[in-house]
Amino acid sequence: RAISFFVSLWFLIFSIPLLISAKKTLIQTKSEIGLFSQIQKLVWDRGLKKIGIFLIARMLYADGLNAIIVMGGIFAVGVFQLSIKELLQLSILMNISAVIGAIIGGYFNDLLGSKKIIVLSLLGIIISSILILFSFSKMYFLIFATINGLFIGPIQSASRVVISKMLINEDQSKGFGLFATSGKLTSFLGPVLVSTLTFVSGSQRIGFSAAIFLLIIGLLLLFRIKNLD
């Protein structure tokens, strides 16, 4: 109960600067917008444009990440018998490592480019997730889970940098709307795949591999995009 209150308070406090500083813009009428056709032009021109492929790739690896975050706690309790206290400690540890990773990733983003950061982060998450699958010690699980969290921060920030660079100023609102939608539209997919595979196989380890599969497909799609930066 207390956590919900503090999260709401945190959200309110850090929304105030945006509410104060955001510029007012005129709202266009429906006849001026042609919203659907504008969105279509944004992602499709005789085939999927670069931004369209990126949004699909991002949707898939975001689903994989969502499955890891949502189902990771269930996996930890079911396979490694973590207590509630240990689970909370792991959550705090992974959040701290994600923040550290985001700071480090921001520095290397300027040096290497956003696409390389996303690719390296995906590889880091995939490899650490595979190591988690084959871990039979609670200590190794905690180590690999913390490493996993280290790459979650950079991939989220770098993905936003990529989409902002791909959009011209007048397309920013539509583009980020699609970006947000691509991360939420199929957010159920990862957990459903993990749950279904776990139920069919009778193994949480095998079920968890569905999240890794989504990450790999998203990574392969990224390789199709040239000059992403």
Kindly give the residue locations of the regions a language model identified.
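A membrane-interface helix-boundary motif in multi-pass transporters
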Residues: 1-9, 196-215
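Multi-pass alpha-helical transporter architecture, strongest
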Residues: 10-21, 209-229
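Juxtamembrane intracellular "pre-TM" segments in multi-pass secondary transporters
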Residues: 23-56
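Short amphipathic helix-loop junctions that connect adjacent transmembrane helices
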Residues: 70-87
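Helix-to-loop junctions at the C-terminal end of transmembrane segments
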Residues: 101-113
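Structural signature of the two symmetry-related core transmembrane helices
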Residues: 116-131
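Helix-loop junctions at membrane interfaces in 12-TM secondary transporters
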Residues: 133-145
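Intracellular juxtamembrane helix-capping segments at the cytosolic ends
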Residues: 154-167
